[in-house]
């Protein structure tokens, strides 16, 4: 439909790539919820189809836009906070902390892909990148503390550290 210039992909992760490929082939720009792929291969395929079609895409990192975050970014860019050497990010959410909770697509690896890392920690990583710049190195560990759900990445705690090549 030529009246449609852009689409919003807000489905379960397992169909993000399929929808993106169809939209790109039709010349439609897109906003896609994160993660755009369930694994690095799907993520690279998403980027490739968007680039090949010459359409614009935006990934749904909505925590970039509050005024406080914008102000912090401006202060950092202006050097008003000094030489930053450490970033500590937290993303606290309660929807997945009940072992008896409803089993949704987010807890099924074939549908969700990266589990907690893709669903929640990607916001923390994006915020570090958005505020400070490209990340050069990452060190991390994780532990699943709710193991009674079907094979997924349920109830995972993840810690990671990033290093910046420019500092």
PLM feature spans:
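Short, well-ordered coil/turn residues at beta-beta hairpins
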Residues: 10-11, 131
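Beta-strand-loop-alpha-helix segment that lines the small-molecule cofactor/substrate pocket
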Residues: 5-6, 12-13, 17-64, 77-79
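Short amphipathic alpha-helix with an adjacent loop that forms part of the alpha/beta core around
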Residues: 1-2
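Predominantly a Rossmann-like dinucleotide-binding segment in NAD(P)-dependent oxidoreductases
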Residues: 63-167
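Short active-site oxyanion
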Residues: 5-7, 114-115
